[in-house]
Design a protein with these regions (language model features):
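Signature of extracytoplasmic/envelope-associated structural regions
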Residues: 1-258
């Protein structure tokens, strides 16, 4: 019998979407990973002088999905962003800067992963895993709290696998006390006006949709394409202390004019 506390979660970067690869990194902050195999069946109802609902059933297609909850770390958050947004080229050194932006004129190049979870002989991988929804959340408290990340992923399918022998990595959790929040006028310079002694917490929700491409001759999808982002699907919620700074922000919102 598997013991979930002995599970580990590993990832490997795929070259071809849906083609399994060996895992190359153990994710260090995972709290839970819930697999969801998607297998569709079709019942065929015919007039046969019977009240039975159907006489034949066939597999009609499949895919895979997963829900992932993790503690945000400076090292592993890159897996999440590149799976959701695109693979970024870092610049600088100590710290590195990685620019992430919503797609505009071209389809993004997102990170496809073989996402593996299990222990002993009970090991399964989501092939072609990408993140479609991600929520980052942190809240100041009496004890400094960590940032949490929740993700919804889709992939080609779940398949049996084996875990590779990978070592733990040293990671650094992202804490609420590490954050700074800036709010600037539209058209101004981002990152200029700091909201000091004001922000108590935040929740940032990002959705980067993906659509399966399906072809004759295969139960499972053969690729992905990425439609435009929905305006209402990407949100930032702030918990703010009502002080003079916030008062002016509220006044500008309720006093808006065409």
């Amino acid at each position: 019998m598997s013991v979930t506390s002995l599970f580990n979660v590993q990832v490997g970067k795929e070259t071809t979407w849906g083609t399994a690869v060996a895992q190359t990194a153990k994710l260090m902050g995972v709290k839970s990973l819930t697999p969801t195999p998607l297998v569709n069946t079709k019942l065929f109802k015919h007039l046969r002088g019977s009240l039975q609902p159907a006489f034949e059933a066939m597999l009609a297609g499949g895919a895979g999905a997963a829900s992932l909850e993790e503690t945000g770390t400076y090292e592993d958050i890159l897996f999440a962003f590149e799976s959701l947004m695109h693979i970024a080229t870092p610049t600088g050194a100590g710290p590195y800067t990685r620019p992430y932006a919503a797609p505009h004129a071209t389809q993004p190049t997102r990170r496809f992963e073989t996402l593996c979870q299990g222990q002993g002989s009970d090991i399964y991988s989501l092939l072609g895993a990408i993140t479609t929804t991600m929520t980052l959340k942190a809240m100041a408290g009496e004890n400094d709290t960590e940032m949490t990340i929740t993700r919804e992923l889709i992939g080609q399918k779940w398949a049996e696998d084996t875990v590779d022998s990978l070592s733990d990595r040293t990671v650094n959790p992202i804490m609420a006390s590490h954050f700074a929040c800036y709010m600037d006028a539209w058209g101004g310079t981002m990152g200029t006006t700091a909201l000091t002694a004001t922000v108590k917490g935040f929740e940032l929700s990002l959705m980067a949709p993906a659509i399966y491409k399906r072809y004759l001759g295969n139960l499972f999808p053969g690729g992905l394409e990425y439609p435009e982002w929905g305006f209402s699907d990407n949100k930032l919620k702030l918990s703010l202390e009502f002080n003079s700074t916030v008062n002016s922000i509220v006044d500008s919102i309720i006093g808006a004019a065409a």
